[in-house]
């Protein structure tokens, strides 16, 4: 966390002493522990089971599984052959050897973090990143690198009544 977020609880109170709703980009055990240490009532935070559900469904592998079900053999949609879920360095190197440049993605990351772009093989730095990611998260997503025309992210808010599209970033 940045220095300005040292005391989260100070930022969670409105002038009239009402508590603000906590809506992080992503929940995890570290954030939950931090909020509890800042005095947030644990009963207002996700349970351990909910955190595990969030972690499982936040992994890129889950998104890839959903994507493959939505694909429906439509030639306008990028098919599953443009990427692999690699469990070791050899699989990563073989994919890059076959496809040239690639994008390496850690299974649990967002907002541009956990992404590396490689061309013509892995550098020693890339290999170290892959080993650490494989060790901590179990896999590395390896995708063919396409020419980027425009980058954006779609933002959604999930709640008990469904999912709302918020906008683009």
Briefly describe each language-model feature range.
Residues 2-98, 110:
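Conserved N-proximal alpha/beta basic substrate-recognition cap immediately N-terminal to
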Residues 20-22, 102-104, 140:
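Generic beta-sheet signal
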Residues 27-29, 107-109, 121, 145-147, ...:
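An acidic- and aromatic-residue-enriched active-site/binding cleft used to recognize and process polar
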Residues 46, 119, 169:
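Residues at the C-termini of beta-strands that transition into short coil/loop
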Residues 68-71, 91, 102-104, 126-132:
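Intrinsically disordered, low-complexity boundary segments flanking structured domains
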Residues 81-83, 101-129, 151-153:
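Glycine-rich phosphate-binding loop of ATP-grasp-fold ATP-dependent ligases
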Residues 92-99, 118, 133-134:
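Alpha-helix C-terminal capping segments
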Residues 100, 125-169:
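Phosphate-binding site of ATP-dependent enzymes
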């Amino acid at each position: 966390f940045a220095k300005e977020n040292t005391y989260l609880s100070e930022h969670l109170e409105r002038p009239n002493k009402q508590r603000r709703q906590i809506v992080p980009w992503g929940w995890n055990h570290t954030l939950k522990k931090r909020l509890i240490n800042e005095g947030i009532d644990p009963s207002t935070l996700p349970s351990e089971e909910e955190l595990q559900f969030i972690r499982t469904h936040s992994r890129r592998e889950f998104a890839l599984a959903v994507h493959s079900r939505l694909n429906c053999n439509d030639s306008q949609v990028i098919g599953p052959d443009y990427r692999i879920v690699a469990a070791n360095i050899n699989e990563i190197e073989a994919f890059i050897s076959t496809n040239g440049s690639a994008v390496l993605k850690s299974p649990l990351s967002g907002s541009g973090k956990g992404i590396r772009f490689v061309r013509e093989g892995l550098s020693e730095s890339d290999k170290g990143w892959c080993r650490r990611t494989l060790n901590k998260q179990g896999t590395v997503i390896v995708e063919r690198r396409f020419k980027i025309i425009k980058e954006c992210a779609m933002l959604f808010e999930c709640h008990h009544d469904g999912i709302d599209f918020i906008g683009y970033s």
